[in-house]
Swiss-Prot record:
[4Fe-4S] cluster 4 binds at C427, C455, C458, C461. [4Fe-4S] cluster 2 binds at C76, C79, C84, C94. PROSITE patterns: 4FE4S_FER_1 (PS00198), 4FE4S_FER_2 (PS51379). One of its GO terms (biological process) is methanogenesis, from acetate. The gene is cdhA1. It comes from Methanosarcina mazei (strain ATCC BAA-159 / DSM 3647 / Goe1 / Go1 / JCM 11833 / OCM 88). Its EC number is 1.2.7.4. This is Acetyl-CoA decarbonylase/synthase complex subunit alpha 1. [4Fe-4S] cluster 1 binds at C73, C77.
Length: 806
């Protein structure tokens, strides 16, 4: 019997019977694999499995960047043998040790994040194929390299929605294999869990890429547009006199139907539609490819979810998936705000009204008979949510629940405070709430106002208050003036970096004359304040780094203004260029950040992209200066995103809370045996400077993070001008934020031309006096001293197989 593929067939000799098969499980992937074999220029690893990258690449990375384990506790409670004490090198009843257990815990978080993005991608892909068909072309802007992550992983270059299916199937298949290794009695070696985590991270970027490219193509999002529209942002942008429909989550599928309903019924100026988290970003991208005037609003990041509910402003809340608080229904109930769950991943125990009538459902929700409902039919969702917001607005105003608490209630709550300090101890960022309460009792609410921006809205303080004071409501009430003026601007997510931008900037990045790419991504679980990401972005933008952002990071960068009242998005261009601030989009748009680095390797470096992860990653690690920042990372998705960057040789700095992820990847910069690569010209070993010296680490303060990130953009292949520019920035930033010169600056000097021009003479004196280097002062040249010699034609690689004659 011939092999079945997708399509339809009929069986002869059966009268009036036709059997139609729309899709055979695995057939799309099998067809893609057959097609892959026919293509030229294919790398060695299309459609990889758990073991594929292990020896060729992952273990090479992990040999240099050794895992640093930070357990949360000494016990393992994973199976019924336990709990087992794993302290002091003891093994559990199953035989696993602390390293293996900790590796499993980190790995579990990575695959959870990968699964989240993959499921997001599967949902959007199936939905958009159902609506638009498999033949819808992937119009993503003026680029030939449309799907770098998919291409590197599968060897395929899909051109339509339907052609993405093999990549989606591959991610799902490998996730099943990865999840199986977590079971008791499976993998026990920490190093192999780390290798599997890196593999999962690469799949995560495939899942994210699928999620974003299908919505860009089908929903008319901006397509690699550096001039995407500016969007109003902040709690102060919401008009309280209008019904407010508030959306929260990451999957914009259902929200587009709300927008369609509003546009069809001419309600865009009569109803406020705004959101939090990545759904907010993506609703501002819908139909914006032609840069029409936007009417939707971005309220802010996840940290504002509870704050916006406590404000009483939303008339209806619609949630979809990812990074949505678990207490939204009970919190909304207090203020008569109906909650609609629009995605099966979050249903909150609410009654399912997907098949119920529109009028019946609106009446149930409006009357308060039910606190909310599950509505998975997007056509109904669009109509019900908008109409319900219009009807709830006057009802809630009449009930007096538009804003809480009253001035009298605020004073009563403040006076109840016993100054016990429990809230201070419970606060994850140690906000001095007792001191603010003390001043508030005296009528000075400025200290409470100061807490508004720093507060991450977790409500842990309220859980421990013996007086049952709703502390978050106290802070928000005291900050009403600030909230009313909380208005920023953010450029709508532009999508991919175009091939043309890569060609224009690739040489500068590889040579080092553009100092590097700084990617500000991740969640708002900041250890200091949200303004830290603004300070970091501004510092690097003024120094002509390319700053790219996604998700909550992109939002928080745009919430603050300079002395002229301008946000960063108004001050700096939106192109992928030196000194450009590029809002790529939502969380799933992170794939385009790794995609940009991959494109540099493929387009500028001439590397084969198809099925060729190790070569692409090797090029990025040695040549492309880039560093990620997830300053408020909290979720499993943040872990998988960062790990996906790591496998491609892109380091990431995380905030102080992120040690709770349990693992960092830090090299020993003093161990010279770790800092050797091959010269691809002849296969000989060549020493390189310790750059980058980590793949994943944490910083305590944003002041510490800035010079750390500048240093992480140094690369072995920098030419002398690029090295001089990068060292100038690193050394200046170290002096500005830490004080003095870095201890190891001299390790990066190969020739006098590497030295920062303005301080060249002084630094040469230090090299002579402190390091014993020989200097020819007449010629102002370094005669001897550097262990690394500059060779402009050297071809550094970690892969022996790439060397000539290998």
């Amino acid at each position: 019997m011939s092999k079945l593929t997708t399509g339809s067939f009929s069986i002869e000799d059966l009268e009036s019977v036709q059997i139609t098969i729309n899709n055979i499980v695995g057939a799309a992937k099998e067809a893609a694999e057959e097609k892959t074999k026919e293509l030229g220029h294919m790398g060695p690893t299309p459609f990889p499995g758990l073991e594929t990258y292990r020896d060729d690449w992952n273990l090479k990375l992990l040999d240099r960047y050794e895992p640093v384990v930070t357990p949360m506790c000494d016990q393992c409670c994973y199976c019924t043998y336990g709990p087992c004490d794993l302290s002091n090198n003891k093994r559990g009843a199953c035989g696993i040790d602390m390293l293996g257990h900790n590796g499993r815990e980190f790995f579990l978080r990575v695959i959870t994040g990968t699964a989240c993005h993959a499921a997001h991608g599967r949902h959007l892909l199936d939905h958009l194929i159902e609506v638009f068909g498999e033949e819808l072309p992937l119009n993503l802007g003026q680029s030939d390299v449309l799907t770098p992550n998919i291409t590197i992983t599968t060897g395929q270059r899909p051109q339509t929605l339907g052609e993405i299916k093999p990549a989606m199937e591959h991610v799902e298949e490998q996730l099943t294999q990865l999840l199986a290794t977590v079971h008791a009695g499976q993998e026990s070696a920490e190093i192999d869990y780390d290798s599997k985590a890196l593999f999962s991270g690469s799949l995560d970027h495939v899942g994210m890429e699928i999620s974003d490219i299908v919505q860009i193509a089908a929903l008319d999002f901006p397509k690699a547009d550096p001039e995407a529209p500016l969007i109003e942002m902040g709690m102060g942008t919401i008009d309280k006199d209008k019904p407010f429909l508030c959306v929260i989550g990451h999957n914009v599928g259902g929200v587009t139907y709300m927008m369609d309903y509003m546009e069809e019924h001419e309600l865009t100026d009569k109803v406020e539609l705004g959101g939090l988290c990545c759904t907010a970003i993506d609703l501002t991208r819908y139909k914006e490819a032609d840069r029409r005037p936007p009417y939707t609003k971005v309220v802010g990041s996840m940290s504002k979810e509870l704050k916006i509910i406590r404000s009483g402003m939303p008339d209806v809340i619609v949630v979809d998936e990812q990074c949505v608080r678990g207490d939204i229904v009970p919190e909304a109930q207090k203020l008569k705000i109906p909650v609609i769950a629009s995605n099966a991943k979050i249903m909150y125990g609410l009654p399912n009204r997907t098949d119920a009538g529109v009028e019946e459902t609106i009446e149930e929700l409006k009357s308060g008979a039910i606190p909310g409902a599950v509505i998975l039919d997007y056509e109904k969702l669009g109509e019900i949510s908008v109409r319900l917001a219009q009807e709830m607005h006057p009802i809630r105003e009449a009930a007096g629940v538009r804003e809480i608490p009253s001035d009298e209630q605020l004073k009563e709550w403040v006076d109840k405070c016993a100054d016990c300090g429990a809230c201070y101890l419970a606060c994850p960022i140690e906000l001095d709430i007792p001191e603010a309460m003390k001043f508030a009792k005296q009528g000075d609410f400025s200290y409470l106002e100061d807490l508004h921006d720093a507060c991450i809205g977790c409500r842990r303080c309220e859980q421990v208050c013996k007086k049952e004071i709703p502390i978050l409501s106290v802070i928000e009430k005291a900050s009403q003036k600030i909230i009313a003026e909380e208005k920023g601007w953010m450029r709508a997510g532009r999508g991919q970096v175009s091939d043309a931008e890569i060609r224009a900037e690739g040489l500068n990045l590889v040579m080092g004359t553009t100092p590097g790419i700084i990617a500000i991504i991740g969640c708002p679980n900041y250890s200091d304040c949200a303004k830290a990401v603004y300070y970091i972005a501004e510092e690097f933008l003024k120094r002509n780094y390319i700053v790219v952002g996604t998700g909550c990071g992109s939002m928080d960068m745009g919430m603050y203004k300079d002395e002229d009242g301008k946000t960063l998005y108004e001050r700096f261009p939106g192109g992928f260029q030196s000194g450009g601030l590029v809002n790529i989009g939502s969380c799933v748009s992170n794939a385009h950040i790794t995609g940009a680095a991959q494109k540099v390797a493929g387009i500028f470096g001439g590397r084969t992209m198809e099925g060729n992860l190790a070569e692409i990653a090797d090029y990025v690690l040695n040549r492309v200066g880039a560093c990620g920042l997830a300053w408020g990372a909290f979720s499993q998705k943040a872990s998988s995103i960062g790990t996906g960057c790591n496998i491609y040789g892109i380091p990431a700095v995380l905030g102080a809370h992120s040690s709770k992820y349990r693992r960092a990847l830090i090299a020993k910069n003093y161990d010279e045996s770790k800092w050797k690569v091959y010269d691809a010209r002849n296969g000989e070993e060549m020493p390189i400077p310790p750059a980058p010296e980590f793949l994943l680490t944490t910083a305590e303060t944003w002041q510490e993070a800035i010079p750390m990130m500048a240093k992480a953009c140094l690369r072995p292949s920098d030419n002398s001008l690029g090295r001089s520019i990068k060292l100038t920035h690193w050394m200046e930033l170290h002096d500005k934020y830490i004080g003095g010169l870095p201890e190891d600056w001299w390790k990066f000097i190969r020739t006098e031309a590497d030295l920062p021009l303005a301080k060249r003479a002084d630094l040469m004196k230090k090299l002579e006096a402190e390091r014993g280097w020989e200097i020819d002062w007449k010629k102002k040249k370094i005669i001897s001293g550097p262990k690394i010699k500059f060779d402009v034609s050297a071809q550094p690689t970690n892969l022996k197989r790439l060397c000539k004659g290998a």
